[in-house]
Amino acid sequence: MSTVLVVGADKGIAHSISRQLHDRGEDVIAACLFDGADLAAAGITVEPGVDVTSQESVEALAARLSEKGVKLDAVFHVAGVMWLDEVGSLDYDLIRRQIEINTLGPLRTIEAVRPLLNEGAKVGIVTSRVGSLGDNTSGGMYSYRISKAAANMVGLNFHHDLSKDGVSVLLLHPGMVATDLTKDFPGEHSYITPEQAAAGLIKNIDNLTPETSGRFQHSDGTFLQW
């Protein structure tokens, strides 16, 4: 990797990815919804005000990068939300909102920056194991599961279409990570830190090849079923 765009870098996993890549000498562009002041203070290039639910916003990001002559060697799309719901009390506005962020977010963002991808570039889209059809043994979490299952399809489609340009795409499950996103997650779980998840996801993208493109991988390195 050399020039890396990290989307959703305000906090959590993407924040840690940005810092770890910067610390090892990569040229990191951190796309943040807010100002990303602490990342900027650390010497990381910050693109503030990037809203993945807005076509205008992500196209403006791509235009700014293009005007600066930026070419991307890797993209980590991490921005996402998780609101829990159950059958009998489904909020369809909430479902639409999660799809807007978790599914259409990576679709519109990667489509916008696609012309900036170098041949041989790598794209990592953070989804979730709960979006796996084969792994769903408990039900519930309707809107989150739906949005992440669809995000997996977004990534698989990008694999097929971008491979023609020499770009590899990986779907990423970070594991059970202790962030604001998971604080209300049901059940007892053994959590890892955002720093641990980031290190695993970076390693996955480092090791990504055209032969492993289009797969779904845990931050611990294991490949997951769809």
UniProtKB/Swiss-Prot annotation:
UniProt organism field: Rhodococcus sp. (strain AD45)
InterPro entries: NAD(P)-bd_dom_sf (IPR036291), SDR_enzymes (IPR052184), SDR_fam (IPR002347)
Keywords of the record: NAD, Oxidoreductase, Plasmid
Record-stated family: Belongs to the short-chain dehydrogenases/reductases (SDR) family.
Record's keyword annotation contains Aminoacyl-tRNA synthetase: no
CDD domains named among the record's database cross-references: carb_red_sniffer_like_SDR_c
Function: Involved in isoprene degradation. Catalyzes the two-step NAD(+)-dependent oxidation of 2-glutathionyl-2-methylbut-3-en-1-ol (HGMB) to 2-glutathionyl-2-methylbut-3-enoate (GMBA).
Coiled coil (UniProt feature): none
Catalytic activity reported: 2-glutathionyl-2-methylbut-3-en-1-ol + 2 NAD(+) + H2O = 2-glutathionyl-2-methylbut-3-enoate + 2 NADH + 3 H(+); 2-glutathionyl-2-methylbut-3-en-1-ol + NAD(+) = 2-glutathionyl-2-methylbut-3-enal + NADH + H(+); 2-glutathionyl-2-methylbut-3-enal + NAD(+) + H2O = 2-glutathionyl-2-methylbut-3-enoate + NADH + 2 H(+)
UniProt-recorded name of the protein: 1-hydroxy-2-glutathionyl-2-methyl-3-butene dehydrogenase
Family matches, as Pfam families: adh_short
pH dependence per the UniProt record: Optimum pH is 9.0-10.
GO molecular function: oxidoreductase activity, acting on the CH-OH group of donors, NAD or NADP as acceptor
Gene3D superfamilies (UniProt xref): NAD(P)-binding Rossmann-like Domain (3.40.50.720)
SUPFAM superfamilies (alphabetical): NAD(P)-binding Rossmann-fold domains (SSF51735)
UniProt keyword Transcription regulation, yes or no: no
EC number(s) on file: 1.1.1.398
Lineage of the species this protein comes from: Bacteria, Bacillati, Actinomycetota, Actinomycetes, Mycobacteriales
